């Protein structure tokens, strides 16, 4: 049983008083006892063989209260906020009211809540139709991309002058005011001219030169250069061009078509297949853009009480996005530490990156939740089972492990949000 009392002097905050039933308390105490009994020594008993009754006689059940609380509190708190119908923001401040022996426990939580949402029009919306047409130029550009992918780098004679798009193999030795700096030297480095691999102005000064030449390249490091001791400074790079290589493209003919796609026999067939592939991709992109536009309009039509999203909600979203992103990298074998080392980014950099758009994401989520409530969307047990099966297949997990990792309320929440999006977008019309 829970009781929600809004704060009189502060918006979007209140006190939630709730009970943990005695049966749940007993279960928590039992689990806590099982975790500790192997560490307890009592004369006359081997380690791990002491009974719970004797343990309580010697130490009192209060000795296990904190561990038992840690075990039972998450589910009890979640049930209490569900019963109260509130959406908490951030971590609550929870304190015990009473924890008497043999009785249910009563707790009090000071909770910040999400702001109230006033929905506007969200059904039968009209948004601009998305372009799904595939032009000949689109097909030609894709064929050109495939052609570039089949290109070969061919070594050129020394008389050939370098052009943008060529690759040069160089040695370079950089200095500032005659003093060499870390990272300013390299040997047999392959540099594609025009790629922007080096600082602005470097690659352009190699255009027009030939293999065998020594070239002095004068540049100025950008003011925001990552190495602060070089930022804004003029530098000289002494460069030796060893080799010049130029892309040679294959002929666009039937043989080329067969090389890039074994399922076709002619260039005409490749173009037709490419056109169909692009049409499918464009249709999917148009569908996604249409849905985004519809949801965006529904969000614009709604309003947030106080016109402000709590900072805690934005911070929660940013951390969730970061954890999800780093978790995906972890699945690819890239640890958190490895990512920061490879990318050169810091946690603050990543936080700033995901801060962009966080307020819109949070507001969209709040409005979709309001639509779920307004439309009385309540996923069935069958839908939850289907969701569990889908997640189990996606992550190659057993279904019971999925249920252990994700609460039923969270599963239902995710399903309901998708149902809300579908209801809004299905009712919309492209004009």
UniProtKB/Swiss-Prot annotation:
Pfam families found in the cross-reference section: FKBP_C, Trigger_C, Trigger_N
Gene Ontology CC: cytoplasm
Compartmental location: Cytoplasm
Limits of the PPIase FKBP-type domain: 165-250
Main location: cytoplasm
Similarity-based family: Belongs to the FKBP-type PPIase family. Tig subfamily.
PANTHER family in alphabetical order: TRIGGER FACTOR CHAPERONE AND PEPTIDYL-PROLYL CIS/TRANS ISOMERASE, TRIGGER FACTOR-LIKE PROTEIN TIG, CHLOROPLASTIC
Name of this protein: Trigger factor
């Amino acid at each position: 049983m829970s009781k929600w009392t809004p704060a009189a002097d502060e918006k979007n905050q209140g006190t939630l008083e709730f009970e943990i039933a005695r049966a749940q308390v007993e279960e928590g105490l039992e689990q806590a006892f099982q975790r500790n009994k192997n560490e307890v020594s009592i004369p006359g008993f081997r380690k791990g063989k002491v009974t719970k009754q004797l343990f309580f006689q010697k130490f009192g059940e209060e000795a296990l209260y904190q561990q038992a609380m840690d075990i039972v509190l998450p589910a009890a708190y979640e049930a209490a906020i569900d019963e109260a119908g509130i959406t908490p923001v951030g971590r609550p401040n929870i304190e015990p009211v009473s924890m008497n022996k043999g009785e249910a426990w009563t707790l009090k939580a000071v909770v910040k809540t999400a702001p109230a949402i006033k929905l506007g029009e969200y059904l039968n919306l009209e948004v601009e139709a998305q372009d799904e047409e595939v032009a000949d130029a689109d097909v030609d550009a894709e064929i050109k991309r495939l052609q570039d992918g089949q290109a070969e780098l061919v070594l050129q004679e020394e008389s050939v002058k370098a052009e943008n798009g060529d690759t040069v193999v160089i040695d370079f030795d950089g200095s500032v005011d005659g003093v060499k700096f870390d990272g300013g030297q390299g040997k047999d480095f392959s540099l594609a001219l025009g790629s922007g691999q080096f600082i602005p102005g470097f690659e352009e000064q190699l255009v027009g030169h030939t293999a065998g030449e020594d070239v002095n390249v004068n540049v100025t490091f950008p003011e925001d250069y990552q190495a602060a001791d070089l930022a804004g400074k003029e530098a000289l790079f002494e460069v030796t061009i060893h080799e010049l290589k130029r892309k040679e493209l294959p002929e666009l003919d039937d043989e080329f078509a067969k090389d890039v796609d074994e399922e076709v026999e002619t260039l005409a067939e490749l173009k037709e297949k490419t056109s169909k592939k692009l049409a499918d991709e464009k249709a999917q992109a148009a569908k996604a853009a249409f849905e985004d536009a519809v949801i965006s309009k529904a969000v614009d039509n709604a309003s947030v009480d106080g016109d402000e999203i709590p900072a805690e909600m934005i911070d929660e979203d940013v951390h969730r996005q970061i954890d999800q992103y780093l978790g995906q990298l972890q699945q690819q074998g890239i640890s958190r530490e490895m990512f920061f080392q490879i990318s050169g980014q810091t946690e603050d950099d990543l936080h700033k990156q995901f801060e962009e758009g966080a307020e819109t994401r949070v507001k969209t989520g709040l409005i979709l939740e309001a639509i779920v409530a307004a439309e009385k969307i309540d996923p069935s047990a069958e839908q939850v089972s289907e969701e569990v099966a889908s997640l189990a297949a996606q992550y190659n997990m057993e279904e019971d492990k999925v249920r252990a990792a994700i609460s039923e309320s969270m599963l239902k929440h995710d399903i309901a949000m998708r149902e809300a999006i579908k209801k809004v977008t299905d009712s919309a019309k492209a004009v």
